[in-house]
């Protein structure tokens, strides 16, 4: 399957699995591409416009020129470079977001999708398998007991930053890309003080700078660098 056909297949797969195991609300399943898929790809947009160094590490050089997924003119079946060997942990993946859309866009990056709730991991695993995503592994585990470490961590609003950071202590080498909404000034200040994060190590990027729909008005990508 090409990238585009995989994205097209996602809605049907999630509707099917959601009828068996409710992991997405009715409102969100009716707006799956905007509320889940495109929101997940906000991380890829951030890399494209603010962190091309990481985008290249993930093998996404061709996304710098455009990609139909983002409504640009260039369709790439595999937006990857040579020798990509990055590992990414999606912690608290739920039914597979942001991990599955990102794994679709970056097929040579190894994604580990982890959640403590077994039924959510089942949905993520079955959807990834149906899409033929060979770069996805799913794990039913709490973060604290997950073995190993990863180059990057991604996650979507599973908790406040001051609670999230202890979960991933010792589990990442380069960056955390965290999708979160609302006014984040106090939350970030609390986390920076509590964990003595260096000044300049935390950045915030509004997805609405590229995606202008009202849904993204207060949606941000938080980048925490080592």
Q: Which sequence ranges carry the predicted segments?
A:
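Conserved SAM-binding strand-loop segment of SAM-dependent methyltransferases
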Residues: 132-143
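Active-site capping/gating segments
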Residues: 183-226
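Conserved SAM-binding motif I beta-strand of class I
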Residues: 110-115
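A short glycine-rich, Lys/Arg-flanked "PGG" loop and its adjoining helix->strand segment in the class I
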Residues: 165-176
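Class I SAM-dependent transferase core
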Residues: 2-51, 57, 61-63, 67-68, ...
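Conserved class I S-adenosyl-L-methionine
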Residues: 54, 85-94
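Conserved SAM-binding loop of SAM-dependent methyltransferases across substrates and taxa
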Residues: 95-108
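Conserved beta-strand signature within the Rossmann-like core of class I S-adenosyl-L-methionine
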Residues: 174-186
């Amino acid at each position: 399957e090409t990238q585009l056909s995989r994205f097209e297949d996602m809605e049907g797969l999630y509707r099917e699995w959601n009828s068996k195991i409710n992991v997405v609300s009715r409102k969100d399943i009716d707006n799956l591409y905007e509320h889940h898929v495109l929101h997940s790809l906000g991380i890829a947009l951030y890399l494209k416009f603010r962190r091309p160094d990481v985008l290249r590490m993930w093998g996404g050089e061709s996304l710098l020129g455009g990609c139909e997924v983002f409504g640009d003119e260039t369709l790439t079946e595999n937006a990857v470079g040579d020798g990509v060997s990055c590992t990414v942990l999606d912690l608290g993946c739920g039914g597979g977001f942001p991990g599955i859309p990102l794994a679709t866009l970056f097929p040579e990056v190894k994604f580990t999708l982890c959640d403590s709730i077994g039924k959510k991991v089942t949905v993520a695993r079955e959807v990834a398998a149906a899409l033929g995503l060979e770069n996805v592994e799913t794990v039913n585990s709490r973060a604290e007991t997950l073995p190993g470490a990863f180059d990057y961590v991604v996650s979507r609003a599973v908790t406040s930053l001051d609670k999230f950071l202890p979960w991933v202590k010792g589990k990442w080498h380069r960056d955390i890309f965290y999708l979160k909404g609302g006014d984040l000034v106090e939350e970030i200040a609390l986390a920076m003080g509590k964990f003595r994060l260096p000044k300049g190590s935390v950045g915030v990027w509004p997805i609405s700078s590229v995606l202008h729909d009202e849904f993204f008005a207060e949606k941000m990508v938080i980048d925490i660098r080592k």
